[in-house]
């Protein structure tokens, strides 16, 4: 009889702690947790991003804050894998590249760049909140603006500011998760 009680108690504790872990995990999926725990994915898997998820991710960019509500951004979503690999050579089939562009040269139009940067971060974080890997690229932007603008069919006068890669990922790899941050004491000053 004592063994049955122990077994029942152990089963109860396992169920209770499992439920508690699920509740904690769900609570840790809020916006602050996504921001604090984000990482730039380096290891992507093949697999498409469903249209409904992609729409949510793009809506996050569209809804980003904008100075004077100018909303200067334009989003070009690249699902064509041949074109995507011209921009990001290690792009994996099914990954999506989202090019964020604005009017101007992409270097001196400060207000537009800041607004587009907010849209880029919103897209990046929305993808991670939905369980996808995401990574922001600025390295390919000059080549993209110089060589691929016509192929991307950017609006007249627009230049790419940044792009976000979105795709499936298995888990956090050592390279992606290894980025340490400076301590608050090194980067923050409170003026009271």
Positions of the model-derived regions?
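Acidic, surface-exposed loops and disordered segments
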Residues: 2-192
């Amino acid at each position: 009889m004592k063994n049955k009680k122990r077994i029942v108690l152990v089963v109860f504790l396992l169920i209770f702690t499992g439920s508690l872990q699920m509740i904690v995990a769900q609570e840790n999926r809020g916006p602050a947790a996504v921001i604090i725990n984000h990482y730039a994915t380096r290891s992507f898997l093949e697999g498409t991003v469903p249209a409904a998820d992609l729409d949510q991710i793009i809506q996050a960019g569209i809804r980003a804050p904008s100075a004077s509500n100018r909303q200067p951004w334009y989003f070009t979503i690249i699902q064509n894998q041949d074109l995507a690999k011209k921009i990001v050579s290690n792009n994996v089939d099914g990954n999506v590249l989202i090019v964020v562009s604005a009017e101007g040269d992409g270097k001196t139009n400060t207000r537009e760049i800041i607004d587009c940067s907010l849209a880029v971060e919103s897209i990046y974080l929305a993808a991670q909140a939905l369980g996808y890997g995401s990574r922001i690229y600025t390295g390919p932007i000059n080549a993209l603006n110089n060589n691929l603008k016509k192929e991307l069919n950017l609006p007249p006068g627009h230049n790419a500011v940044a792009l976000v890669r979105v795709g499936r990922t298995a888990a956090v790899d050592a390279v992606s998760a290894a980025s340490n941050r400076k301590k608050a004491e090194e980067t923050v000053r409170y003026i009271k």
